[in-house]
């Protein structure tokens, strides 16, 4: 086997919007409200091993905007990517899948959410950058430091 075949390999095969939904339960009346909405953002990361070296990473963003107690809108988007990861030590795959891949996908998710919100007639909401390393470390701590949050590339 040549040295080239044993070199670490990381490749983005595809980035795609897997799912998106937008609800405006109080439209059109909510557009007449003068109060600034409160905004809540949740982000989640999941990983699934599709083949020995191929992973689907899914970053889900949920944004809820409320004016008083009324929901102005609720949007959920799932940005996905298929990554080919080869010749990387097993202990490095989980951080790669839990930190590097979501960091690559998040700008696409942020753009898709911002676009949908403005197309729905609301002022733009720009999601702040997310420190996926901190989220990854927090998940590990919550799991009691179990070895490999996704030993076979399963959930984060």
From Swiss-Prot:
The keyword DNA repair does not apply. Coiled coil: none annotated. It is found in: Cytoplasm. Keywords: Chaperone, Cytoplasm, Protein transport, Translocation, Transport. One of its GO terms (molecular function) is unfolded protein binding. The keyword Cell cycle does not apply. GO terms for biological process: protein folding; protein tetramerization; protein transport. Belongs to the SecB family. This is Protein-export protein SecB. It comes from Paraburkholderia xenovorans (strain LB400). The lineage of its organism: Bacteria, Pseudomonadati, Pseudomonadota, Betaproteobacteria, Burkholderiales.
